[in-house]
A protein has these predicted regions:
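Conserved HGGG/HGGXW glycine-rich cap/lid loop of the alpha/beta-hydrolase fold
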Residues: 2-43
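Active-site loop/oxyanion-hole signature of alpha/beta-hydrolase fold enzymes
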Residues: 30-32, 36-72, 88, 112-117
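Flexible "cap/lid" loop of the alpha/beta hydrolase fold
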Residues: 48, 88-134, 189-190, 195-197
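Gly/Ala-rich beta-loop-alpha elbow adjacent to hydrolase catalytic centers
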Residues: 74-79, 83
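Active-site nucleophile elbow and catalytic-triad environment of alpha/beta-hydrolase enzymes
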Residues: 153-172, 186
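Catalytic His-Asp charge-relay segment
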Residues: 176-182
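Conserved loop-alpha-helix segment in the C-terminal half of the alpha/beta-hydrolase fold
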Residues: 183-216, 221
């Protein structure tokens, strides 16, 4: 039995991992799916000041409060940054780090830096008053038409600072086992770049035929890879 902590990407909440939670639980694992501040049930009132550092610390505190050890920490998309920082901050608790179409941090760079100019333009186009960002177009998430309405009604704004706060200059990955699950075909240059980088840095890389949000479009297949 393993202990999984599943962390959602931008605009979402712990709800997005529901079917993966069910599948892993049936396989005998313990599953946690926390919701980052200002997301999920609290999406109507996100805090604009929340950034990468605060989200990482929030996740570290969650692991401590729950008394979790021997954790497999799974981050999707944006949460690749959050989970990587949390794993580095709490190496005694996190033994395995898995990124699902996740963004790998680089010291001194923020999400927007890593994603490049096209993302910067999209970020500006989706900016809301008060330092928030509205969700990307639905097709960016790669969910099926059957799940589209259910998925979209649960999305909410996300703090701009989360995309613009840089990773600490002294960041280094922990010694935890690392795996990257690439949802193919990758829809953006960023996701292809992340998969290639993970492979070049010696991560265990797995391909999954799925849309970007594999926990919605291919939950059983994703659960099988995590298991």
């Amino acid at each position: 039995m393993a202990t999984f902590v599943l962390v959602h990407g931008a605009f979402q909440g712990g709800w997005v991992w529901g079917r993966v939670d069910e599948a892993l639980t049936e396989l005998g694992h313990r599953v946690h799916r926390p919701t980052l501040g200002g997301c999920g049930l609290h999406r109507a009132r996100p805090e604009a000041a929340l950034g990468l550092g605060q989200y990482a610390q929030e996740l570290v505190q969650y692991l401590k409060d729950e008394g979790l050890i021997n954790v497999t920490l799974v981050g999707h998309s944006y949460a690749g940054l959050v989970c990587s920082l949390a794993a580095a901050a709490l190496p005694e608790a996190v033994v395995r780090l898995v990124l699902v179409d996740g963004v790998l941090p680089k010291p001194g760079l923020c999400f927007a830096d890593i994603a490049g100019e096209p993302f910067g333009k999209m970020l500006a186009a989706h900016a809301l008053p008060g330092g928030l960002v509205r969700p990307w177009p639905l097709e960016s998430f790669g969910v099926s038409p059957e799940a589209a309405a259910w998925f979209q009604e649960r999305l909410g704004p996300f703090p701009l600072a989360a995309f613009t706060e840089p990773c600490p200059q002294d960041f280094q990955f922990s010694e935890a086992k690392r795996a990257f699950i690439s949802c193919i075909p990758a829809k953006t240059p960023l996701l292809r770049l992340m998969a290639n980088r993970a492979e070049s840095e010696g991560w265990d890389v797995h391909a999954l035929m799925s849309g970007h949000c594999a926990m919605v479009s291919a939950p059983l297949e994703l659960s099988g890879l995590l298991h």
